[in-house]
């Protein structure tokens, strides 16, 4: 939010605070203008400007909707999307980490159309349901092998799935006669959704500010970002030991009898793409198990091949009690989320609901037949095309190609990732303790340069996040690396200018 507000001020004071070269760059570049200034975009043929549109846009500042034309995406094709002027962009974030099979997979479209023509909707309440929802549950339970799962529950996406996780844990502990075992421990910089409870679980302050969050039953422990938070001379293994000890100390302080669950992403996504340090999950799981605390694996971003394994739990030997799925579950062609629960959890919930007469939780769109049909087809494709194996094969080209820029760049502090997910963090002097002034908007400038050259990235402050479609070709990876390099060079020059200006 600081960066957005700073960019707004920067936009209003361009001529005063920037060298003429920067002003020329901004005034001559429609992509930069969209991000950095309040000047309207130039007239485009065959398109109607949408500045001041009627939608309350998610994760967008009010001034952006009021003052700027949005980038309107009109078409997708493979690893690319096209805006309403016909300009082509390599979609390096796969939408929002989710269009795993690219933008025009005909089998997914056919699955949706066939189901729409057969049964466009029916619910799953009161022991009524549809074949696609039953079939998808069966496939998912067979597919997830990190721990034996017994039941699946469907939602519309990841946020309401994580809300449901909280209710399940509470229901489970009430059934066991442990009504005080209700607190949740999540991690700083985690992301688990933006609804009331999932935003509380998330460890990102902007999701809490002015929403009266987080909820009081949610606690946050250390972010496992080794580069940023390790002590001098501390190895990754020692760092993991310290974080596991801090987690145990928090549990003891609060009282183990009050902690119901611990939730974690295998690789943290929106918080900056943060893979776990060595031995982290081994040590954290031991602590959680010691105090009879359920482990929830939030696989919304990592599942279905993103890390080069079918699930993130497979890569890091995580054996969860509950799992959250969404995004690539349908390659985002239809909204759907899912929860998988272990036999122990499922047995307790089934027994308790039988005593009460009903399990009083669900949504209109739980197990929506069209969403389930598309998800089933997506899972078939992941298996038939060996998508996790393909990701493992092309990942070195992606990871090594982007990371190669880090050693020679004075503004890259760290480039980190695994499989087809990667984050870059811009800092001064390559130090985690020397961020650039927020008003410089270094990350936003890099994003604008990428967009100018035909690639969309996710900007998170001075962090750049990438997770391209899992079907990205080697040639497209090379294009991604090339555009990244061009944007980086321009950003380095811009930082040099801003530093010179700052010294005056």
From Swiss-Prot:
Listed GO molecular functions?
A: 4-aminobutyrate:pyruvate transaminase activity; cobalt ion binding; pyridoxal phosphate binding; zinc ion binding
Summarize where substrate binds, as residue positions.
Answer: 191, 327, 362, 458
SUPFAM superfamilies tied to this protein: PLP-dependent transferases
Lipid metabolism recorded as keyword: no
Residues where N6-(pyridoxal phosphate)lysine occurs? 327
Where on this chain does pyridoxal 5'-phosphate bind?
158-159, 298, 363-364
What do the Gene Ontology cellular component annotations say?
cytosol; Golgi apparatus; mitochondrion; plant-type vacuole
Per its Swiss-Prot or TrEMBL record, what regulates the activity?
Inhibited by gamma-vinyl-gamma-aminobutyrate (vigabatrin), beta-alanine and ornithine.
Upon gene disruption, the observed phenotype is: No vegetative phenotype. Oversensitivity to ionic stress but not to osmotic stress. Sustained roots growth upon treatment with E-2-hexenal. Increased gamma-amino butyric acid (GABA) in leaves and flowers and defects in pollen tube growth, guidance and fertility. Cell elongation defects. Suppresses partially the ENF1 disruption pleiotropic developmental phenotypes (including abaxialized and adaxialized leaves).
The record, for InterPro entries, names: Aminotrans_3, Aminotrans_3_PPA_site, PyrdxlP-dep_Trfase, PyrdxlP-dep_Trfase_major, PyrdxlP-dep_Trfase_small
Determine the domain of life of the protein's source.
Eukaryota
Q: Changing residue 312 to D does what?
A: In pop2-7; loss of activity
Q: Where in the cell is it found?
A: Mitochondrion
Checking Gene3D superfamilies in the record gives:
Aspartate Aminotransferase, domain 1, Type I PLP-dependent aspartate aminotransferase-like (Major domain)
On tissue specificity, the annotation reads:
Expressed in flowers, siliques, stems, leaves, shoots and roots. Detected in reproductive tissues, in the stigma, style, abscission zone of siliques, stamens and pollen. Not found in pollen tubes or the transmitting tract. In vegetative tissues, found in dark-grown hypocotyls, leaves, guard cells and primary roots, including the root tips and the elongation zones. Not found in the division zone of the root. Expressed in the outermost layer of the shoot apical meristem (SAM).
Q: Which UniProt keywords apply?
A: Aminotransferase, Mitochondrion, Pyridoxal phosphate, Transferase, Transit peptide
Q: Please convey what the UniProt record notes about how activity depends on pH.
A: Optimum pH is 9.0 in the forward reaction.
Summarize the protein's role.
Answer: Transaminase that degrades gamma-amino butyric acid (GABA) and uses pyruvate or glyoxylate as amino-group acceptor, but not 2-oxoglutarate. The pyruvate-dependent activity is reversible while the glyoxylate-dependent activity is irreversible. Cannot use beta-alanine, ornithine, acetylornithine, serine, glycine, asparagine, glutamine, glutamate, valine, leucine, isoleucine, methionine, phenylalanine, histidine, lysine, arginine, aspartate, threonine, tyrosine, tryptophan, proline, or cysteine as amino donors.
Give the PANTHER family listed for this entry: ADENOSYLMETHIONINE-8-AMINO-7-OXONONANOATE AMINOTRANSFERASE
Q: What is this protein called?
A: Gamma-aminobutyrate transaminase POP2, mitochondrial
């Amino acid at each position: 939010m600081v960066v957005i507000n700073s960019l707004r001020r920067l936009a209003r004071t361009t001529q005063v605070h920037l060298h003429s070269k920067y002003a020329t760059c901004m005034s001559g570049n429609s992509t930069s203008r969209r991000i950095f200034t309040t000047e309207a975009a130039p007239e485009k043929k065959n398109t109607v400007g949408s500045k001041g549109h009627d939608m309350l846009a998610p994760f967008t500042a009010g001034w952006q909707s009021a003052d700027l034309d949005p980038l309107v995406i009109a078409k997708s094709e493979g690893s690319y999307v096209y805006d309403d002027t016909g300009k082509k962009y390599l979609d390096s974030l796969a939408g929002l980490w989710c269009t795993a099979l690219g933008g025009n997979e005909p089998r997914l479209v056919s699955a949706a159309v066939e189901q729409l023509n057969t049964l466009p909707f029916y619910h799953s309440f009161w022991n009524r349901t549809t074949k696609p929802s039953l079939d998808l549950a069966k496939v998912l339970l067979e597919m997830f092998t990190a721990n034996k799962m017994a039941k699946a529950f469907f939602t519309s996406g990841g946020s309401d799935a994580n809300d449901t996780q909280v209710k399940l844990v509470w229901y489970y502990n009430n059934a066991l006669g442990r009504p005080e075992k209700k607190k949740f421990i999540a991690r700083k910089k985690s992301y688990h959704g933006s609804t009331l409870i999932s935003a509380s679980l998330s460890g990102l302050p902007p999701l809490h500010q002015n929403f009266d969050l987080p909820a009081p039953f949610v606690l946050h422990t250390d972010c496992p970002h080794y580069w940023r938070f390790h002590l001098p001379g501390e190895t990754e293994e020692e760092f993991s030991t310290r974080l596991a000890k801090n987690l145990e100390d928090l549990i003891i302080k609060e009282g183990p009898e009050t902690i119901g669950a611990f939730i974690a992403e295998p690789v943290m996504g929106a918080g900056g793409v943060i893979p776990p340090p060595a031995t982290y999950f081994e040590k954290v799981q031991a602590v959680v198990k010691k105090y009879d605390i359920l482990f929830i694996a939030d696989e919304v971003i990592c599942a279905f091949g993103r890390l080069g394994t079918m699930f993130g739990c497979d890569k890091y030997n995580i054996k969860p009690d509950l799992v959250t799925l969404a995004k690539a579950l349908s390659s985002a062609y239809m909204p759907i989320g899912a929860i998988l629960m272990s036999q122990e959890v499922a047995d307790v919930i089934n027994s308790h609901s039988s005593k009460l007469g009903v399990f009083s939780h669900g949504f209109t769109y739980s197990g929506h037949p069209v969403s389930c049909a598309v998800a089933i087809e997506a899972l078939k494709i992941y298996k038939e095309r060996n998508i996790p194996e393909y990701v493992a094969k092309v990942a070195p080209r992606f990871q090594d190609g982007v990371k190669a820029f880090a050693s020679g760049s004075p503004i890259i502090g760290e480039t980190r990732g695994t499989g087809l997910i990667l984050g870059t963090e811009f800092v001064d002097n390559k130090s985690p303790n020397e961020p650039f002034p927020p008003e410089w908007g270094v990350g936003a400038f890099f994003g604008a340069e990428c967009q100018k050259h035909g690639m969309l990235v996710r900007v998170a402050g001075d962090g750049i996040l990438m997770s391209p479609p899992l079907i990205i070709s080697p040639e497209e990876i090379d294009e991604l690396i090339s555009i990244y390099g061009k944007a980086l060079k321009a950003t380095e020059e811009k930082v040099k200018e801003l530093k010179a200006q700052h010294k005056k």
